[in-house]
Structure formats: C-alpha cells, structure tokens
C-alpha cells in the first residue's frame, strides 16, 4: 500500500511525530510502513542479523547505530534476509553498503549514508529498547511510515485507506 507522509501529516498532525530530514532512500521500495522493532548497536550487525531471521510481516526494523557512518550496518546479505523473511522496511541511523544490490530489492531502506566498509558481526547491543534520534523517541511497538519525503512516527496504526488520503 502506498504511503504518503505529507498527507499523513496533514490528516494526523496531532498524532504523529516527524523525524528530522536526515535520511535518504536506498532500497527498491520508495515507501513502507509497519510496527517498529528496534536494535541499538555500534558498528556491529550480529543482533541485526538475528532479528532479521524472525518473521517480518508488518514490521519495520529500526536500527540505532548512533549516527556513526564509519561502518555499514546493513549490506546486501542482510537486506536479502529481510526480504526473504517478509520485513516491510529498514531504517538505519547509520550507514549501508552495496547500493547497487539494495536498490533492486523489494524492501524499503532508509539510512544516513553509504560507505563500503562493513560492520563486524558481534552480538553487542540491545533489542526492543527505546531509541532516540532525528528529534523523536522510537518505542518498540510504535508505527513508522516512510517515503521519499520523510519519516513519520505514530503510537498507533494510522488508517491509510482514509478518503482524505486517496
């Protein structure tokens, strides 16, 4: 289903938080939404891989890498794992790599920047913990909506089929 964050902000202005415009789109889908699962980690993606092994239908993985872009937290292998397990999208407060592959995959991916250096695969970090970046606090179980215009956060599922959005 198509997501239009501009229209969501117009309709649900009192219900949503808008993430600062610091992200770019790197995946094959330009818009996506779902219930948030968070991973907080620093230059390692072992926990990310573990979470992406789970069923992802209706879910978006939100990775807080501290805004560090020295190492890519998502690469082609992890993005493909997400696709294989039905994840709707990935948002990374950090870097990604292998853009030529990422842009062909049937998943939305937003991140700060690309870099060719990969992360280590240690299992250091936290899963399903509140994280704060881009001017908002993301709580596990919140809903996130993303498109090429921006990222919007809501504590509850928004009606994307509203006549106002059509």
Curated annotation (Swiss-Prot):
GO molecular function, one term: endoribonuclease inhibitor activity
Alphabetized Pfam families for the sequence: RraA-like (PF03737)
Record keywords: Cytoplasm
Annotated localization: Cytoplasm
InterPro entries the record matches: RraA, RraA/RraA-like, RraA/RraA-like_sf, RraA_gpbac
GO BP terms, alphabetized: regulation of RNA metabolic process
NCBIfam families: NOT-MenG, PRK09372.1, RraA_entero
Subunit description: Homotrimer. Binds to both RNA-binding sites in the C-terminal region of Rne and to RhlB.
UniProt function note: Globally modulates RNA abundance by binding to RNase E (Rne) and regulating its endonucleolytic activity. Can modulate Rne action in a substrate-dependent manner by altering the composition of the degradosome. Modulates RNA-binding and helicase activities of the degradosome.
PANTHER family: 4-HYDROXY-4-METHYL-2-OXOGLUTARATE ALDOLASE 3-RELATED, REGULATOR OF RIBONUCLEASE ACTIVITY A
Protein's UniProt name: Regulator of ribonuclease activity A
Classification lineage: Bacteria, Pseudomonadati, Pseudomonadota, Gammaproteobacteria, Pasteurellales
Gene encoding the protein: rraA
């Amino acid at each position: 289903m198509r997501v239009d964050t501009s229209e969501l902000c117009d309709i649900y202005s009192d219900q949503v938080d808008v993430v600062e415009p610091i992200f770019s789109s790197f995946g094959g889908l330009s818009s996506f939404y779902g219930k948030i699962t968070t991973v907080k980690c620093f230059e390692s993606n072992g926990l990310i891989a573990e979470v992406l092994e789970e069923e992802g239908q209706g879910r978006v993985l939100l990775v807080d890498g501290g805004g560090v872009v020295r190492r890519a937290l998502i690469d082609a292998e992890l993005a493909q794992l997400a696709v294989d397990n039905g994840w709707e999208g990935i948002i990374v407060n950090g870097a990604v790599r292998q853009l030529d592959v990422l842009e062909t995959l049937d998943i939305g991916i937003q991140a700060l920047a690309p870099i060719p250096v990969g992360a280590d695969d240690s299992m250091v970090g936290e899963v399903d913990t509140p994280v704060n970046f881009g001017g908002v606090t993301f709580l596990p179980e919140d809903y996130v909506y993303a498109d090429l215009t921006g990222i919007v956060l809501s504590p509850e599922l928004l009606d994307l089929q509203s006549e106002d959005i059509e």
